[in-house]
């Protein structure tokens, strides 16, 4: 048997982190088993669906690198198939027409609540029977699935273990509305059957749907897939993760400067573990992932942990991979990196200091763009009269360098210190402010090596002019 999983979001909003984790688990299980992963868009809610949401889901999946083997399939393109299966159940007396209006059902529900009874649909209720008997052909009706009344539905959840629900606790589910459109729970079953889905990985909010769907599978004569229901993701305050906790859309994390590898690594650990290991390459995730190792308990989303992971991936990933995802942020900040050092070299030097790609894009501007002003605080502290001579000596030595390397620049700084008998800080910090415009950067010799000789000379001269003007105005 070829394992086949699916991710089946409804296009009523963005791809949120809970859905992304479900998609990741489903994708990993398929890859771990040498199987296939299907993407299906469950767009039967015609009032709430939008093409914008479909596009956002596809963009999020592509950004995370969760490539699908089949699809995307759209339920709205399969209504004829669903209605064919509804008619099959009607013909076999496994479904029936119900003419009870919404108003009548609301009235019955209110009576049940007043009598402290559990509100539920009962086909044998006198008022419902009367409505069905009084109906004429052509009157609006829904089609209900005739749920078994005896016995129980038992299934072995791959995460939660054995689950059993008595059939007498379940209503006769509506499977076709009065407007002729099929309902979610029915479409899902027909889709999973037609698409050969063997394993359904989804959120725990679907557990109540599962026994109802299992009865429909069996009524259709379809094989019942294996189910695995993931626990929810909580905010750091213990409440269900929502917009008030900050970003919940996958693409918001892109916008905030997270790498997809970091977000995938973080999401896989929200409920799954392999010993004490924290960092997983995609290959390791695929090889090690198991549904049996997924926790039944809810996991709390921790942004600090995600930032730590993101910093790890910025520091340790192939710089070309980081550059690929950095480009979006460079475009947002209107920073052209074609006029300057290779972006991969800059990433190697600056990346280890950054927790997000937004920070990285902000911190590399001085490699590619000249500036006309120094950061006020850094200039006030380091571009003073005492820095004039060290910078003048450094400028002369910089102009004399013929082989522009980090090693030669390091030696230049050491030579300035030796010649003037000063400590490293007396030249290092003024030089850093001069060539970067601010007081924070990696090692100044390495920074200068990438900025290039021409720019460094011009910036040191600008710093000396700043000091002269400052002294003149003192």
Swiss-Prot record:
InterPro entries (UniProt xref): aa-tRNA-synth_I_cd-bd, aa-tRNA-synth_I_codon-bd_sub2, aa-tRNA-synth_I_CS, aa_tRNA-synth_I_cd-bd_sf, Glu-tRNA-ligase_bac/mito, Glu/Gln-tRNA-synth, Glu/Gln-tRNA-synth_Ib_cat-dom, GluQ/Sye
Subcellular location: Cytoplasm
GO cellular component: cytosol
Disulphide linkage map: none
UniProt entry tagged with the keyword Ion transport: no
One biological process term in Gene Ontology: glutamyl-tRNA aminoacylation
Keyword Cytoplasm: yes
EC number: 6.1.1.17
Motif mapping: 'KMSKS' region: 240-244
Catalytic activity: tRNA(Glu) + L-glutamate + ATP = L-glutamyl-tRNA(Glu) + AMP + diphosphate
Keywords from the UniProt entry: Aminoacyl-tRNA synthetase, ATP-binding, Cytoplasm, Ligase, Nucleotide-binding, Protein biosynthesis
Motif ('HIGH' region): 9-19
NCBIfam families: gltX_bact
Subunit structure, as described in the record: Monomer.
Family of the protein in this entry: Belongs to the class-I aminoacyl-tRNA synthetase family. Glutamate--tRNA ligase type 1 subfamily.
Name recorded for this polypeptide: Glutamate--tRNA ligase
